[in-house]
Design a protein with these regions (language model features):
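Transmembrane beta-barrel wall of Gram-negative outer-membrane proteins
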Residues: 72-106, 118-163, 190-194
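Outer-membrane beta-barrel translocator domains and adjoining extracellular loop/strand segments
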Residues: 40, 73-75, 105-116, 162-177, ...
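Short acidic/polar hinge/loop motifs at secondary-structure boundaries
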Residues: 4-30
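Extracellular loop and loop/strand-boundary signature of outer-membrane beta-barrel proteins
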Residues: 66-68, 120-125, 177-184, 236-243
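Transmembrane beta-strand segments that form the barrel wall of outer-membrane beta-barrel proteins
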Residues: 30, 58-69
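N-terminal periplasmic accessory domains that precede
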Residues: 12-15, 40-63, 79
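Sequence/structural signature of outer-membrane beta-barrel proteins
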Residues: 64-70, 101-103, 158-160, 218-220, ...
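Face-selective signature of the C-terminal outer-membrane beta-barrel domain
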Residues: 134-158, 185-280
Length: 280
């Protein structure tokens, strides 16, 4: 078992890289209890994946491409690769996915105020570029019919760039003011996580003992630059820059001990330790 706390963008990328034939079942739990996480406060999407049954190597390659039919100023492509390998009690799996979004556009606005002899014209151009890269490598080893161990590594890179250029002209009572603005914003987001787990079946009724350890590192760097030049009635420049950073180290280990009292009831106990550090 592995708990993922994803943003909306990360969840979409994870689901897009799943193959339908690898999914055993999907459960949506609106209100999750402590049996899923000790500090659970929201809902849970529980995805159960199939194990590779046959030995050997199997894989899949896919490619998706989208574009705007109207002006072709927006496009998106998504290549992905899945590879799985099984030999005796050892199973290896890997996934690589990439998504690239590009969008350009603009707008023009012209206003006339007859009661105040005022004219305002504005022209804005925008360019948006974003990519999302995911990599996963994992293994499961069945020690025997009752015991198994596993390890998994995940990495995500998600850079985002947005550029906006604008020109505005305001004329009132014969006086004019022209402004030229430039905005550049970038966000570099990265995530790395490592998970190790051990599972033991205690009896035929379904009693189990599980231990899962997880380390996650998140890094987010933002850069926002904005410059405006005014000329005409007033002549001056305005420049601002904003560069926040945030780094998170998260380590968690949990052990679950489920005792089956009968075929229809069980006693679930567990212990969890979590340590979070943040630097921003």
């Amino acid at each position: 078992d592995r708990v993922l706390k994803e943003t909306g963008e990360e969840l979409v990328a994870y689901l897009e890289n799943l193959k339908a034939e690898d999914i055993l079942k999907i459960e949506v739990i609106p209100y999750a209890g402590a049996e899923y996480d000790a500090n659970a406060t929201g809902g849970v999407i529980k995805i159960t994946l199939k194990k590779q049954r046959e030995e050997g190597l199997e894989g899949a390659v896919s490619m998706r491409y989208y574009t705007s039919i109207v002006d072709q100023k927006a496009w998106n492509y998504q290549p992905s690769l899945n590879l799985n390998y099984k030999y005796n009690a050892l199973s290896l799996y890997s996934k690589v996915g990439y998504r690239r979004n590009n969008w350009t556009g603009g707008n023009m606005e012209s206003d006339r105020f007859l009661d105040r002899d005022r004219i305002m014209d504005a022209n804005t151009g925008m360019a948006h570029r974003q990519s999302h890269t995911t990599f996963q490598l994992g293994s499961v080893y069945d020690i025997n019919d009752k015991q198994s161990v596993g390890a998994e590594f995940n990495m995500t890179e998600n850079p985002y760039h947005n550029n906006t250029d604008g020109t505005a002209l305001a004329i009132e009572s014969g006086n004019s003011l022209t402004s030229q603005s430039l905005s550049r914003s970038t966000t570099d987001y990265s995530l790395m996580s490592f998970t190790a787990n051990y599972s033991l079946k205690l009896d035929t009724l379904g009693s189990t003992f599980k231990t899962v350890a997880n380390y996650t590192y998140r890094n987010k760097e933002d850069s926002v630059y904005y410059h405006t030049n005014y000329s005409g009635m007033m002549n001056y420049d305005s420049t601002s820059r904003y560069m926040p950073t945030a780094r998170y180290d998260m380590f968690a280990i949990r052990s679950d001990f489920d005792i089956a009292l009968s075929k229809s009831s069980k006693l679930a106990t567990g212990l969890k330790y979590q340590r979070n550090t943040m630097d921003n």
